[in-house]
């Protein structure tokens, strides 16, 4: 298992660099991540690296117990770290819904779908969670506003790491305020791109 853990660690490190190496790779990653939005970032990276087309992933026990679906014989799991901090060298395996089949106890798998009738409630919840949103003319605009608010509120927690990450890059010579502004724009634009892929 330690050998496989090392291979997945290498894959993770390589993928971390690859997804940010150019805009096309970042967009490709976002296209994968928007389908598995409940996963941690490290899990999303590893799903992208191993099965970028995965639409809904769970562990085998969850497929069986929660949805009454059985994993197909010979299906290959998607290896992810068991815990985010990697304090233990342990992997967990996810399987995509396409790797499963229904049983007589199957329940419908809720693939994320936004209905028009919930739009006002969702916008209200976004505003109560992330603060006042300037443009609420559509759900997409409200989500963009919420993403900007969240980036603005949370960026102080990440600034030191962000400045450290600029060492050795073209951003090293750029003023810290500009780096922070670029980061906020990347977050907001990434959210917008993901939303355009899930057709809100």
Question: What annotation goes with each model-predicted range?
Answer:
Residues 1-198:
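N-terminal accessory/interface modules of nucleic-acid-binding and processing proteins
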